[in-house]
Amino acid sequence: MSKDIKSVEHSPKIHQRNDPQHVNDRTFFIDASNQSLTAIPLEIFTFTELEEVHLENNQIEEIPQEIQRLKNIRVLYLDKNNLRSLCPALGLLSSLESLDLSYNPIFSSSLVVVSFLHALRELRLYQTDLKEIPVVIFKNLHHLELLGLTGNHLKCLPKEIVNQTKLREIYLKRNQFEVFPQELCVLYTLEIIDLDENKIGAIPEEIGHLTGLQKFYMASNNLPVLPASLCQCSQLSVLDLSHNLLHSIPKSFAELRKMTEIGLSGNRLEKVPRLICRWTSLHLLYLGNTGLHRLRGSFRCLVNLRFLDLSQNHLHHCPLQICALKNLEVLGLDDNKIGQLPSELGSLSKLKILGLTGNEFLSFPEEVLSLASLEKLYIGQDQGFKLTYVPEHIRKLQSLKELYIENNHLEYLPVSLGSMPNLEVLDCRHNLLKQLPDAICQAQALKELRLEDNLLTHLPENLDSLVNLKVLTLMDNPMEEPPKEVCAEGNEAIWKYLKENRNRNIMATKIQAWWRGTMVQRGFGKFGELLKPQKKGKTSPKDKKGKKDVKGKPGKGKKK
């Protein structure tokens, strides 16, 4: 269930858009994004009272001098274009508060223009191939609250960044930092620091000076230890330390009483740190691939937990402590050594997503059928034992939307799948299916049906009645009806074939019925007898006792 169990997600605030009902000379907002524009329409500059302009995701190559007419503009989004340089007129927008130039191949030297935007509060320069930032930006701008520099080639920050005394959020993910930017430790207004996916080997003790820090992202670095001073960041609620080199967490972290989310996946902990069980306010806990064999008894105290990732560990059974977490909505147990689930699992009445892929179940774990709120079930067995059946009782999961049962040895699917009104995704890839139940055509909510690498030769003739089905995959099946060449053309060709084949069958039935009726009218037999199929080589008449005439001899009581 990799798309549900993942590292801590976060993103900077996105400015709210309110599309105007009318466009006139007093329009305050224009959205011209996603229009394949190669230039900014000059008509935009006639709306002199514009406050917000969205031009992202186009092919714009330059900003015209006419931009200076927009004296009142506060928000300008130009991300995902082809800008290489910025015109000097951009620096005349004295009211501009939010500027997004992300995903443009901008020359860093042209960014000097930005230093004239003295009202700027938000500057986003994600993935612009920057190796350095013009120092003058940090010298001249004093109101920055958000600075986005993710996905560049930065190795350090200019010392002048300490002038940003109002900075609250800084995003430096996926750069080339090997040393933690010490300058950040004097920016006391910082609330969010994102340094994921760098090569940082240590966090300085001075991090404790940031007492207002709320979210700290340090995943995918080279941290072997953590500074005890981090416990002084008393407002810290989100901490992502996934995929580092940690073996333990400082005991002083127990003082972080506002923790709601922590990521520790991909570290060599081998056991759950005792202090984590004291963070009873935790909502999300990532412990995947940490070498765990068991959970502490006190783990049951995490009663507010909604998301728990225990995937890729060494668990031989589903810990009973989990069954006490009544608010749990997502549980990842993938890639362990679990062979059986406890009957108490049904107490997780709010569970919506359950990952069991890659375990050691000998048969389908029917304990999951008591999870009435379950919406997604992952039970593909890409390693170890293979499941040979899915029980008909699967219909008990009436809330189920997605079922992933790939990489098993299933030869058939339960008919009851057709009575699951909310089923949208059914993944049966890499099994031994020889046919689909006709009842599958009743699963009207179905949007994706993945059937690659099975033994299918035919599809149900009414499969085209699934009007919501958008994805149907049939590669690596010995298909005959429809033929492989039809299947290769996609859904539309398959639906057309099924419809035409169905019409042919209806016509054949009508012709057969007409022929039989005609034969009866002409006295060639009773209608019921004509309906009986005749076997090859068994057409000789029988006597009253049911015995056939012997060839060359008359039947008993008959004259030769």
UniProtKB/Swiss-Prot annotation:
Domain of life: Eukaryota
Region (Disordered): 1-20, 529-560
Annotated LRR repeat ranges: 23-47, 48-70, 72-95, 97-116, 117-140, 141-164, 166-187, 188-210, 212-233, 234-256, 258-281, 283-301, 302-325, 326-348, 350-371, 374-397, 398-422, 424-443, 444-466, 468-489
A GO cellular-component term linked to this record: cytoplasm
Matching Pfam families: LRR_14, LRR_8
InterPro entries listed in its UniProt record: Leu-rich_rpt, Leu-rich_rpt_typical-subtyp, LRR_dom_sf, LRR_domain-containing, LRR_R13L4/SHOC2-like
Biased composition (Basic residues): 533-560
Every IQ domain range: 504-533
Keyword tags: Leucine-rich repeat, Repeat
The name this protein goes by in its record: Leucine-rich repeat and IQ domain-containing protein 4
